[in-house]
A protein has these predicted regions:
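Class I SAM-dependent methyltransferase SAM/SAH-binding core
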Residues: 67, 73-115
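Conserved class I S-adenosyl-L-methionine
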Residues: 1-60, 75, 79, 98, 156-179
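A short glycine-rich, Lys/Arg-flanked "PGG" loop and its adjoining helix->strand segment in the class I
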Residues: 139-151
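Short catalytic micro-motifs in class I SAM-dependent methyltransferases
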Residues: 130-131
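Short alpha-helix
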Residues: 175-189
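A conserved beta-strand element that flanks and buttresses the S-adenosyl-L-methionine
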Residues: 127
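Conserved S-adenosyl-L-methionine
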Residues: 191-202
Length: 217
């Protein structure tokens, strides 16, 4: 697949807006990419540190309602469903084609992270793994993610470090984040916020590409 062509013609930035045209472009791009298992796999290794970090921060998921925001094919949701069948997991993604791959038993909803189709405090917890980078209107997306989590609920975000920009090819709307910048956005809505550098594997020293932000509302 020609990723440069597929994701060309757009410029992200601090003042970027998710116009109807841009939203349609992003949705179409991921709809087309849904069948590319090499770039967008349906599963992940449940041993990666991302899984352990999210699970440890969210705590006991039994009987809880949890949002996977920007879930793609639901690969993280699949792992958490297998680990805790009593957890009610919801996956939201802008691409309906991506949602077709989400495993049975996981609730799905098509939509944007900037306008989550859920009531205030609907979830006990929420996480977003490498999806906030595609939300375009980052401040609004963070606000929405916090809005739908009940007071005392936990939020985990894993995404890329702006200081490493250029290390990977990206669609032109994509945004990476500074550690302190995303902390500031979360602190507007959450009473506890922390962040750390992470690696895919717990015993591998982080190379600075990935950051995790952990919050309690």
């Amino acid at each position: 697949m020609n990723w440069k062509r597929l994701f060309s013609g757009l410029r992200g930035g601090r003042d970027a807006r998710l116009t109807p045209e841009l939203r349609a472009r992003i949705q179409s791009s991921f709809d087309q990419a849904a069948g590319d298992e090499a770039h967008f796999p349906s599963t992940i290794d449940p041993r990666i540190y991302h899984v352990k970090l999210i699970r440890n921060h969210l705590g006991d998921l039994g009987g809880k309602r949890v949002l996977d925001a920007g879930c793609g094919k639901g690969r993280f949701a699949r792992v958490f469903q297998e680990q805790e069948p009593a957890c009610e997991i919801w996956g939201l993604d802008i691409s309906e084609e991506m949602l077709r791959f989400v495993p049975a038993g996981i609730h799905t909803r098509a939509g944007s992270m900037t306008e989550l189709p859920f009531e205030d405090g609907f979830f006990d917890a929420a996480y977003a793994t490498e999806s906030l980078e595609h939300a375009v209107e980052i401040e609004q997306a963070v606000s929405e993610l916090c809005r739908v989590v009940k007071p005392g609920g936990r939020i985990a975000i894993i995404d890329k470090n702006a200081e490493q920009w250029g290390k990977l090819p990206t669609p032109e709307w994509e945004r990476w984040f500074t550690r302190k910048g995303l902390e500031r956005l979360l602190r507007r809505h959450c009473r506890q916020v922390s962040s750390r550098y992470i690696s895919y594997w717990e015993d591998v020293e982080p190379d600075g590409l990935f950051l995790a932000w952990l919050a309690v509302k």
